[in-house]
From Swiss-Prot:
Coiled coil: none annotated. Residues 1-56 form a transit peptide. The keyword Chloroplast applies. Signal peptide: none annotated. Keywords: ATP-binding, Chloroplast, Nucleotide-binding, Plastid, Transit peptide. It comes from Larrea tridentata (Creosote bush). This is Ribulose bisphosphate carboxylase/oxygenase activase 2, chloroplastic. GO terms for cellular component: chloroplast stroma; thylakoid.
Length: 435
């Protein structure tokens, strides 16, 4: 048996020849298992240098890599984590699954879905395009946003800036110009999103949009939450409007976020990770309709926007910047209608194009307008820019003012309730002789 073991041992431990070098016999351990008759042979060649033997992996050539290559996944990660997580739904403890399709198990199938639906991106430069930003407006907005990104010692900074004022004074557009100037793409919300058929949905949406803005800040880009016409969605407009649970929860949610701006959680999902602070900008016409504790000074900083004569002239220069209207004519138009909002002058400019549209309609015929506008091979018509003279601007401006006065003066709703007549509308036509 000893001979048998020796034979086996001698065969298994024969010197291995690798690249011309033999294994040295001294490396073979001496053990009783192999027997005493084991031959120990010396190396015939000197030991090779370990630095001469290298294993090198060739880099992947993207030109040779094709989409049909079944081994493509070895070099590139082509898995979809979202779908992998979704497949595991039902096998994960429900403690880690959030309700209402807001947890990690809900697959985001398109990369476009990662871009927030409320993200507003601007393609304008207020310097190049000639838009006017009121200095007082810009100062208030820039200081508020900057303060919220600073850590000032022992100072409680209001998270919300409420910009309010008359209708059509350019509050939202001035905000957008300042955002574009600062390089901010805000997360947008409007008053229509502050009510829903489902109780609690608007409050959840505010938290969701706030966290989306916080994620953008976390990635190193400034952002803010911008809510248009907050009073129209969350305020009480007299006894005729109903105060719903959603109105109450929107006010309460904004109060809670203002008190805890770095700990905003979605309903049903709670973790201890803090989120960046996101400044909130809201606009409205009358903040007295909002819940009073929301607009107190510690939570909301208020700014009443009433454009001065210089502001109105500056904005109107931007409105008529492509029409070659002389500056002195713009000043005359602004001074002629001192009580009108800034939006009035935009409507005035649009009204001047009525003559061009009327001329085009008479050329093509009323019965073929649909074919020319919607189903035309030539594309939509193009108009030459009409010449805007001071007389034409004043004429159309007076027409707009007259229509405003009719709405305020006639008030047909009261007439309909009291008698079957058209009120003073017919009286005007009788006086003009056109009845």
């Amino acid at each position: 048996m000893a001979a048998a073991y020796s034979t086996v041992g001698a065969v298994n431990r024969a010197p291995l020849s690798l690249n011309g070098s033999g294994a040295r016999a001294s490396l073979v351990p001496s053990t009783a298992f192999f027997g005493s008759s084991l031959k120990k042979s010396a190396a015939k060649f000197p030991k090779a240098s370990s630095g001469n033997f290298k294993i090198v992996a060739q880099e992947i050539s993207e030109d040779q890599q094709t989409d049909k290559d079944k081994w493509k996944g070895l070099a590139y990660d082509i898995s979809d984590d979202q779908q992998d997580i979704t497949r595991g739904k039902g096998m994960v403890d429900t403690l880690f699954q959030a309700p209402m399709q807001s947890g990690t198990h809900y697959a985001v199938m398109s990369s476009y879905d990662y871009i927030s639906q409320g993200l507003r991106q601007y393609n304008l430069d207020n310097n190049m395009d000639g838009f006017y930003i009121a200095p007082a407006f810009m100062d208030k907005l820039v200081v508020h946003i900057t303060k919220n990104f600073l850590s000032l010692p022992n100072i409680k900074i209001p998270l919300i800036l409420g910009i309010w004022g008359g209708k059509g004074q350019g509050k939202s557009f001035q905000c957008e110009l300042v955002f574009a100037k600062m390089g901010i793409n805000p997360i947008m919300m409007s008053a229509g999103e502050l009510e829903s058929g489902n109780a609690g949905e608007p409050a959840k949406l505010i938290r969701q949009r706030y966290r989306e803005a916080a994620d953008i800040i976390k990635k190193g880009k400034m952002c803010c939450l911008f809510i248009n016409d907050l009073d129209a969605g969350a305020g009480r407009m007299g006894g005729t409007t109903q105060y719903t649970v959603n109105n109450q929860m929107v006010n309460a949610t904004l109060m809670n976020i203002a008190d805890n701006p770095t700990n905003v959680q979605l309903p049903g999902m709670y973790n201890k990770e803090e989120n960046p602070r996101v400044p909130i900008i809201v606009t409205g016409n009358d903040f007295s309709t909002l819940y009073a504790p929301l607009i107190r000074d510690g939570r909301m900083e208020k700014f009443y926007w009433a454009p001065t004569r210089e502001d109105r002239i500056g904005v109107c220069k931007g409105i008529f910047r492509t029409d070659n209207v002389p500056e002195e004519d713009i000043v005359k138009v602004v001074d002629q209608f001192p009580g009108q909002s800034i939006d009035f002058f935009g409507a005035l400019r649009a009204r001047v194009y009525d003559d061009e549209v009327r001329k085009w309609v008479s050329e093509v015929g009323v019965d073929t307008i649909g074919k020319k506008l919607v189903n035309s091979k030539e594309g939509p018509p193009t108009f030459e820019q009409p010449k805007m003279t001071i007389d034409k601007l004043l004429q159309y401006g007076n027409m707009l003012v007259e229509e405003q006065e009719n709405v305020k003066r006639v008030q047909l709703a009261d007439k309909y309730m009291s008698e079957a007549a058209l009120g003073d509308a017919n009286q005007d036509a009788i006086k003009r002789g056109t009845f």
